[in-house]
Design a protein with these regions (language model features):
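Polytopic alpha-helical membrane-helix bundles and their juxtamembrane interface segments
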Residues: 1-266
Length: 266
């Protein structure tokens, strides 16, 4: 079974935001075009979770984990649809609270989903490489990396949130979700390493690549405080977002391809 295309195609997909930027240049429609691309890749991420979940029997732990992970793109997609066709982002309107609720639910789903995936090794009785102390240290390092990447933006968003700005609260919720998710990347990486040499390495390895893509996506939030070129940082942000979602789809397809129903977790 050849999984190399699943590794290569996400990098090809990640070229799309750059091609859009090159084609449109400094056009005022660039941001709109990239927003449309973002909507598509969020659908891709949701599809990935559904495809992966379908690889397991109903009620299986891994099915629940993937479906929970899929709540994040599902709620964000609902938010996008509502604010594209119905609601507007005006200060002091109920729509602000609707957006905050949907982002909270999306981040709760993301945290719960990554947490469930990160403890799959325990459910399956797999021995992870390294001692428990070393794993705890690596999780601590992952947490610090998450704080370093999202911290500066969160400080600004905290100030906005304290002044009653719902957008600041929404961004703050997203930042907290990202920090927790980054801390949980470590068990996912170690699970992939424990699976090396077998077919199950591929879905876990590709999932690791997806989570790394999200880390790079959030890193652009730090870069935009240094680089004043908004189009530059926006393009890179959407490039890494696309990479993360495409790798997630590859992971979902790979999970399904290895016929996981025969090796489903209890």
């Amino acid at each position: 079974m050849n999984f190399r295309p699943y590794l290569i195609l996400p990098f090809v997909a990640a070229l799309v935001p750059a091609l859009i930027t090159l084609a449109m240049g400094s056009s005022p429609s660039l941001a709109t075009a990239l927003k449309m691309e973002v909507f598509v890749v969020r659908i891709v991420a949701l599809t990935a979770a559904l495809v992966a979940a379908n690889a397991f029997d109903r009620g299986d732990y891994m099915q629940r984990a993937w479906l929970t992970y899929g709540l994040a793109p599902a709620f964000v997609t609902i938010r996008d649809l509502l604010f594209t066709f119905w609601l507007t982002r005006e200060s002091g309107t109920p729509s602000e609270y609707v957006e905050a609720l949907l982002i909270f639910l999306a981040n709760a789903g993301q945290i719960a989903g990554v947490w469930m995936l990160s403890r799959a090794w325990q459910i399956a009785g797999i021995e992870l490489p390294g001692s428990s102390q070393r794993r705890a240290l690596l999780i601590g390092i992952g947490t610090l990396i998450g704080i370093a990447v999202t911290g500066p933006s969160m400080v600004l968003n905290l100030g906005d949130a304290l002044h009653g700005e719902m957008r600041g609260l929404v961004a703050l919720i997203s930042g907290i979700g990202d920090i927790v998710s980054f801390a949980l990347i470590v068990p996912v990486v170690l699970t992939a390493l424990a699976m090396r040499g077998g077919l199950l390495f591929w879905p876990w390895g590709l999932l690791t690549a997806s989570l790394a893509g999200w880390l790079l996506c959030d890193l652009t939030g730090l870069v935009r405080h240094i680089v004043e070129n908004a189009a530059f940082t926006l393009t890179w942000r959407e490039t890494f977002r696309t990479l993360a979602c495409a790798f997630c789809l590859s992971a979902g397809i790979a999970q399904h391809a290895v016929n996981s129903r025969d090796i489903a977790l209890p």
